[in-house]
Structures are given as structure tokens and as C-alpha cells.
Amino acid sequence: MSVLPNAGNNESSVTAPKMFGDPDLDRMAMEYVGNMQRYRENIIIPKSNGPVKIKTNEEKFIETAVESCGFKCTMACVMGYGLGAALGLFSASVNPNMADPFANEKKQTAREVFREMRSTTHSYAKNFALIGCVFSAVECTIESHRGVTDWKNGTYAGGITGGLIGLRAGVKAGIIGGLGFAAFSTAIDYYMYSR
């Protein structure tokens, strides 16, 4: 008893039932089960919650680009630069002039104040951009290597980033920087994942 219809003889498949006693049921069953060549317009995808949307190739391309390590590093660098510039501008604006007010020195002109403000803002911005880029690159590399997205990635990345940045001041500063940055990253991840 074959489930596939005879390709050469259509009349024999209609007249002689293959699966059921009724030829109409047999034709219907063979159309739904046996015909593997038919074009399927509607694909039924089981859904759990809400509607199921199949992504187009363009959406998949954009999603892949946005989730890449290069894009994450670039975004962290740009956003770190912006945050550092804002903090640098704020700290430069509240920084008091350390010159003695009773000394006979000339006061700073507006141009000198703005030049100093610009250099402070740029210095903060560069440092924050560097920290953001290094942290993002290390975290993305660890996440890609481990294949898991959890709080440990941020902790490891924080330890490595803090260690690398603190290493400029010595080994002891590198160890303290790594531990501090790892603890801070863990606290931030815990706060973000617990909400």
C-alpha cells in the first residue's frame, strides 16, 4: 500500500483508493499529505504570545549589523565621548580659579577661560570614549567566546578594562582598578537584570 500517487497513471490513483475506502477522501489526503511539490503560500508558525512576525532580509541584515562587536564599540566610544564632554564641561565650569585674589596678577580673559574649558572637556571626553570602547570590545569578545549573555561577561570585562587602565600607574593600581571596575560592573548588571 503506497502513500504516493502513481505519477504516470492519474486515473488509477483516483479510482483505486490508497489510504481510505472513499476516493474523495483519498484524493484530499494525497493532496495534503502526499504532494510534496506544491508551493506553500501560508506557513503556519506556532505562536506563544502575540503575533509572530517573520523578519525580512533587510531586518536581519540591520539586526546583524547592530549586534556586531564593531558597532557596539563605535557606539560606546561615541556615547562615552558625549558623556565625558558633558562631565568635563560641568567640572570645568565649577572649577574655581586657584589664583590668589589678592595678588597683583591679571585676571583671565574670557578667551583663556573658554580655552581651558575646551581642553578640560576634550580630556574628559577622550578618557570616557577610551573606557567605553575598551569595555565594550572586551565584553563583546568574552560574550562571543563564551556564547552566553549573563552578568559574568560584564564582570570579566570590567576586571580586564579596569586592570588595563590602572596598569598605566603600576601593577598595584592595575589590580585595584580591575577589582573596582569589576565590582562596579557587577553592581550595574545586577541592578539592570533585577528590574
Curated annotation (Swiss-Prot):
Q: Where in the cell is it found?
A: Mitochondrion inner membrane
User: Which pairs of positions does the record mark as disulfide bonds?
Assistant: none
Outline the segment boundaries, as ranges, of region: Disordered.
Answer: 1-20
Keywords assigned by UniProt, alphabetized? Membrane, Mitochondrion, Mitochondrion inner membrane, Protein transport, Translocation, Transmembrane, Transmembrane helix, Transport
Question: Which Gene Ontology terms describe the biological processes this protein takes part in?
Answer: protein insertion into mitochondrial inner membrane
Q: Which GO terms describe its cellular component?
A: TIM22 mitochondrial import inner membrane insertion complex
Q: Which residues cross the membrane?
A: 74-94, 128-144, 164-188
What GO molecular function annotation could you give as one example from this UniProt entry?
protein transmembrane transporter activity
- Tell me the domain of life: Eukaryota
Task: Enumerate the InterPro entries for this protein.
Answer: TIM22
The protein's topology relative to the membrane is: Multi-pass membrane protein
Q: Which family does it belong to?
A: Belongs to the Tim17/Tim22/Tim23 family.
Q: What does this protein do?
A: Essential core component of the TIM22 complex, a complex that mediates the import and insertion of multi-pass transmembrane proteins into the mitochondrial inner membrane. In the TIM22 complex, it constitutes the voltage-activated and signal-gated channel. Forms a twin-pore translocase that uses the membrane potential as external driving force in 2 voltage-dependent steps.
Q: How does it assemble?
A: Component of the TIM22 complex, whose core is composed of Tim22, associated with the 70 kDa heterohexamer. In most cases, the 70 kDa complex is composed of Tim9 and Tim10.
> What protein name is recorded for this chain?
Mitochondrial import inner membrane translocase subunit Tim22
Which organism is this entry from? Answer: Drosophila melanogaster
Organism placement in taxonomy: Eukaryota, Metazoa, Ecdysozoa, Arthropoda, Hexapoda
